[in-house]
Amino acid sequence: MRKKNIIITLTILISILFAQEFKLQFSFIPTGQGFANGDSNKVLNSIGGSFSQESSSDSIKVGDGFLKSSQNVFSEPPEISIYNFPSIINKSSEGVQVEAEVFDLNGIKSANLHVQVGGHNNEIIIPMTENQNNIFQTIIHDTLIDIANFRARVFAEDNLGFISNSLFKTGSINFKNNEMTMSHKNSYYPSGIQKNSWRLISWPGIPSNLSLAESNLNEGHVFYKYDPLSNEYIIPKSIELGTGYWFKHNYKEAVIFDEDTSTSIPLENYVVNLKPGWNIIGSPFSFPVSFKKDSTVGSLITFGIANKNGWSAAQNILEPWNGYAVFSANNSSITLIPFYDDNQSRSRTPSLEEWSLNIKVESESFFNYMTVIGRKEFAKNLTDTYDIPSPKFLENKLSIVTSLDSKNSYHYISDFRSTADFNGVWDLRLNAELGQKNIFISTSENSFFPEGLYFSLVDIQNKSINYEIIKTGSVVKYNSDLSLDYKIVSGDKNYVTITSEKILENIPDKYFLSQNYPNPFNPKTKLDYELPKRSNIQILIYNVLGQQVKILINKEQNYGSHSIFWDGLDQLGNEVSTGVYFARMTTSSFTQTKKMLLLK
């Protein structure tokens, strides 16, 4: 419209000048010429230049303001003033008509519609034709109207080669005939979901029927939705866009979800809101998409690869029909990006001191790749948003977790520390269901390592050190129902060697129960004991008749040196009488008894 207004103004002005019998001689308009001196009459024009009429001539000279304005008008690209694109498209054999109003003083050389289908970087160019004055139209063929949806923009070029383009426009597409199906080539589950295996799923697009019929596994299948506020699983009643669900069935054939009628959403950034804690989400797009998130949101992980169960490492894209678990330290969000432009891909460059190590465990039937340790510039050595707790999942037969306090609280799958330190020790615990034999521990680098950084894996149970853990991994012969303890030592070579050896030196060589002290005692005495590895341990008090008097401890306990007290009370809290008592320590492979004397 600006260009139209300018040309109208120029036309009116020229008409006025001709009406007053002024003669425009453009040969007198050199670029940059100053105004005439002497007895000339100067007329300020409305565009910012001036007219000057010399007394010796009937002609009018126009100042350079007029020329520059006219030059600017003709050098501007075409104006796309109207671009009509349907907000809702019904899939049909007729295609979709798109039109735009394009104007330029130089005339329009060409107008084209650039169509970009979801999941593709290239743009398909469709010529537009001028059906009436300045109105250009074209038809988007039915073959481009796919469940992936598309977006489009108009490009116009004038006769001087100047080009302009509109913004992208996109709409919703309504589909019928089961076109929105899990068997689509872009689906994470193109062959469906096999029986008796938990999987995470979500729905791309919006099904016309959002209801989920309530069912349990005994009836054939079951859905579960995770509620991060209550930390519980509930049976959902409806499908929610951007939400992931646990699904399991026991039907004979693989299950493939189809939707009779559904709608593809517009190809615009889609925000998935997150609550504090673990969230299970999905993508509403019918093709793989990237995403962006802030530092308080952890990595996205998913469950199951092909026919093997387990948890993945960090995922960089969200695929249709799949579900993803993600931890958020507070109320936050993830933005799904159907088209990742170059200016969106910029991220913070890690400092040279930062590093990240993915620790993986895998057995014949299960895997777990989600544990990560490392250092970040803004992380703290205490608990912060970079430290992610282990999730409450429906199925987790194998895991390796970390402890943030070097005690017995092994509840984290992510432990990042400050780059202010170079050397450090990470405590790890391997948990596995009985039957998960021949477990393989390996690592993968999620980043470049700082120069001079070394690692070792200290095996507490076998009292061994693997200095080549990054290259070779480590095989575990798992034949116990107990958790196994390990340590990752990182830092300079000297620190890693000395610290790894010192860790082994501080591990007791054997089970041991000390004599109580004081002995005789009244009414309290102390017992020290040592465990060479993590063990189920009992320490019981008996009288001379062999009757059990008190259970001092009966639990799984970490390796190392420990102490416990007996206060002279029985199991009911009553004082026992003077006499001889026995303290017996028992593990799966060890028993030792100490005689004690209570004197009042």
For each predicted feature, which ranges?
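Short, compositionally biased serine/threonine- and acidic-rich segments at solvent-exposed termini, linkers
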Residues: G63-N72, N466-N506
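Terminal processing/anchoring signals of secreted or surface-associated proteins
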Residues: N41, Y245, Y324, L457, ...
